[in-house]
């Protein structure tokens, strides 16, 4: 997986490379962080729904796994393009501290909604792999800002039933684990979730946490949509250019449209 930072999502659609992008807008308490906005090609008036591509690794992480900021990686750029083509603004950003800066970004969207042309009442989140624990903080009952919906792709969720898979992976790979000690009971019940799973995931923590989360989430009757790519490896949307992978990416875009676009 040495090329994981440059690979693009396996689904290609006409017009992806032509979406409008506003780059390196300042946000954060000291205005020292940057965000990119990918806009739908439709030139209509008014505000758009939006999706935040959540970053769960500290921007100060050393050693740096790549010279690219997460907002410039192949997965992020291509996913933002696909989201924009779906009629939703996609937001990619830089950070220093994952949880605090994600909350700062939410606040910025609410405070600057009009000039950004974003409807702050229709914001979702999407996160993959080790970025998922940070995204989970937004759907906790004590979260200051909550998304309308959330997509968690092949990622670590919560350590439940005494497990330590997520905590161990966070120590190994360096991602934030703000959900340590939390349970499914801490989650809101009104945020629809799409959870995707790679049946052949090479990283045991991912499916171990997903499987426990799904079991307990169903007991608690959470609004979960679950998709399992039985033969998919980790990051199958990058490494498995198959019909199944492309269908799941399309399902992801459909899920976001259904929950964020008022006209659908």
PLM segments and residue spans:
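Short, flexible/disordered intra-domain loops and linkers
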Residues: 62-74, 204-205, 241-244
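C-terminal catalytic histidine-bearing segment of alpha/beta-hydrolase fold enzymes
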Residues: 211, 218-264
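Short amphipathic alpha-helix adjacent to the substrate-entry channel of hydrolases
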Residues: 65-90
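N-terminal cap/lid segment of alpha/beta-hydrolase-fold proteins
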Residues: 1-46
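The feature captures the conserved acid-bearing segment of alpha/beta-hydrolase catalytic domains
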Residues: 149-150, 155-219
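Primarily recognizes the serine-hydrolase "nucleophile elbow" in alpha/beta-hydrolase
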Residues: 104-180
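Short beta-strand element of the alpha/beta-hydrolase
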Residues: 46-58
